[in-house]
Amino acid sequence: MKKHLNAVLATITACLILLNISCNKAKSAEANTIAAAVKKDSVTVAKPEPGSIIDTADYNRRMIALSNNDTTGRWPVKTPYPLPGAILPYHRIIAFYGNLYSKRMGILGEIPKAEMLKKLDGEVKKWQAADTSTIAIPALHYIATTAQGAPGKDGKHRMRLAHRQIDTVISWARPIKALVFLDIQVGHSTVKEEVPTLEKYLMMPDVHLGIDPEFSLKNGHVPGTKIGTMDATDINDAINYLQKIVRDNKLPPKVLVVHRFTQGMVTNYKNIKICPEVQVVMDMDGFGDKILKKSTYLTYIKREPVQFTGFKLFYKNDIRKDPNGMYTPEELLKLIPKPIYIQFQ
């Protein structure tokens, strides 16, 4: 009986061993199957479309490069990451500024179209050669609403120019893949009142906005007799409007250029809203010799950081006293931080 029991136990043990081996093989086979499936899925899973995500490491690297070894701790500014499709800091914008109704307001409108576009292309190439790490792209920065000495019928001291000229500028820009900026001088009006008049254009992905505090005369002075001012609340009115347009129309981020060359032109800069939908450029807008322009940039742009910086060059006023008075790309790239938006007037 004992021998018989031992034989049964031996048989059961052998069966259990075989069963364990079989189970392990099954688990191993299952694991291999899962691994193969995972490997297969990792190959066949749909990748995001180009531009549907942002490479934050690349963005950070570019922002650090723009800060140009700043030691003050102000740059780069800590802001939310932009939405995919952002222009900055991946590109440097080279813009020609002006108005088609006047030859005195800038290079855009001062000389014939073909000559102007050729000159713009030359400036873009100079910047591309000076900084090969950042793609230089052209832009036409058109003054769509101009401040006026006369009050006009509504007493707002501003003139909204005909949209057909905006259409013309856009028709010039698109064949050369240039951006378009529409600039607003509010006079005695407000940003909140004026920006919506350009909505149909701002809904276009290649059209952006500029606002000029110099011609915002809240105190009642006639534009051109005093330098105006905008508070962060005024600038935020533009940002909020652009943010909504981007969200509602699923657009890439808009660029907002804010001109500045005095302390009083922008107040409460720390309260300027930065959001993923809008990229803010504070543009050094003053003319004069190199020492004056650099001082203006360092005092009002570098010292009061918002997000990105710009620098305006004047073909005539900058060289009035010195034929070599206009900054070169190489010289401007030594500034801290480096400007990412360059405007010619």
Label each region the model flagged:
Residues 24-159, 274-278, 292-345:
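Alpha/beta catalytic barrel-like cores
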Residues 213-251:
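Substrate-binding surface in catalytic domains of secreted glycosidases
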Residues 19-22:
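C-terminal motif of bacterial Sec signal peptides marking the signal peptidase cleavage site
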Residues 126-128, 135-214:
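Substrate-binding cleft of extracellular glycoside hydrolase catalytic domains
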Residues 186-191, 247-265:
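Aromatic-lined carbohydrate-recognition surfaces of secreted/lumenal glycan-active proteins
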Residues 163, 202-213, 232-235, 277-292:
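Acidic, His- and aromatic-enriched active-site or binding-groove loops in soluble protein domains
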